[in-house]
Amino acid sequence: MFVPLLGFEGSRPRLVHSELDASLVAPIVGLPGFRMEFPAVAVACNQSYLDEVNGYGQLRYARSSCPFDVYSTLAQITRDLDADHLQVAPLGTKPQALGAFLFALRREDIAEIVYDHPIRRANRTEGIGTTHLYNVSDFVDAW
């Protein structure tokens, strides 16, 4: 099963998925997003991919700013779909990527991280947003 955490670059999940042998796709969109319009933008940017893989039926949501919510969403996907192998592509936010990595570390028996290596465009983003701090140690110690 392929689980892409969707961002704004609609070609990336398709490219990663093309390298895999996954028939079922359960995409995750950040909701709420860092800005109100971001979830709708992410879905719009990935619309052709979601149509192509029938991804709307298994579409899930996890807060863009919370790695622990992504972790819980991945655990829920595993339970709901009785998944024995997840290929997770952290293509969304950095906190979502952290949640994906925590899940893969905890569930290394079924989860793996798959990632592309995009070429960064010039003048893409400016400035620095809010800094988020996460107590990962307590989360890991609770395992």
Task: List where the protein language model places each region.
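A polyampholytic, Gly/Pro-enriched intrinsically disordered region
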Residues: 46-54, 131-143
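Short, flexible loop segments at boundaries between secondary-structure elements
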Residues: 108-140
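Short Gly/Thr/Asp-enriched flexible loops that form oxyanion-binding sites at enzyme active sites
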Residues: 96-107
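Extended, well-folded catalytic/binding cores that form a central cleft or groove in large enzyme
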Residues: 58-61, 77-78, 84-85, 103, ...
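Gly/Ser/Thr-rich loops at beta-strand to alpha-helix junctions
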Residues: 4-14, 33-34, 89-98, 120-121
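Redox- and metal-dependent alpha/beta enzyme cores, enriched for Fe-S-associated oxidoreductases
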Residues: 5-77
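Short beta-strand-loop elements within alpha/beta enzyme cores
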Residues: 83-91, 114
